[in-house]
């Protein structure tokens, strides 16, 4: 029996959106993505205790300063979890920069270099890592610098066409346009509470971005993210990559209904437009209330979970 997950794999690279090693073993994705919220959830699992202990021991060996120890411990823990995942997936792990650095280009660049150095020290080459950065103007500029250094980036919390365009123009390796969080916003801010997959605002957003990239010949990979239901996933079959939570991977694996490719650009490739200026980026992005609110909210939520992780690690230091 061919499952929907099998069919999806034939047209899209399937990525696991989790830090749960058992789930990754079960669904055998090509890549895996993590974020501060997923690291926090994974850290509560008993099998991760040795990774926490090792991160704490590493931090204590680096510095006697408590504040620095905390920074080193959280960076090392994120990398330790990434290293465990890389034992299972054949492709890449996405590890996220502290969301509190989202508006600081230089600090983001420095944090990314540090995370890469930790992976390199453990014998992992750059071609197996993606550094996740929020798709702010400053984050996109940081990614532009990092890409030139051979550090590939995954630009996340992407909700607007302006963000997507700026990422492509910066030569970013991969973007993660969010689907479910866009749907959440429209449900909360309009009278319409139910959407068929084809009319889902998040699905429409990713489809537009995918077609724009192909139309203008951008090499940036489009990886749809943040799904609320299987319908959103099947409606984006054919997207370059999709990062999917274990519960939805399970649904796809248990369903054998035929899957039809929905995304495929067959038109001509056009000449690229002039890159957006900073002023144009902000005008276009800020013209979309949903994108403004969800980007800010996403950064706040990741920062809150980063702080919870720090509280947990502080007790160990």
UniProtKB/Swiss-Prot annotation:
It comes from the Bacteria. GO terms for biological process: carbohydrate metabolic process; pentose-phosphate shunt. Keywords: Cytoplasm, Pentose shunt, Schiff base, Transferase. The active site is at residue 132. GO terms for molecular function: transaldolase activity. GO terms for cellular component: cytosol. The keyword Cytoplasm applies. Pfam families: TAL_FSA. Pathway: Carbohydrate degradation; pentose phosphate pathway; D-glyceraldehyde 3-phosphate and beta-D-fructose 6-phosphate from D-ribose 5-phosphate and D-xylulose 5-phosphate (non-oxidative stage): step 2/3. Its EC number is 2.2.1.2. InterPro entries: Aldolase_TIM (IPR013785), TAL/FSA (IPR001585), Transaldolase_1 (IPR004730), Transaldolase_AS (IPR018225). It is an enzyme of class 2 (transferase). It catalyses: D-sedoheptulose 7-phosphate + D-glyceraldehyde 3-phosphate = D-erythrose 4-phosphate + beta-D-fructose 6-phosphate. The keyword Transferase applies. SUPFAM superfamilies: Aldolase. It is found in: Cytoplasm. Homodimer. Transaldolase is important for the balance of metabolites in the pentose-phosphate pathway. Belongs to the transaldolase family. Type 1 subfamily. This is Transaldolase. The gene is tal.
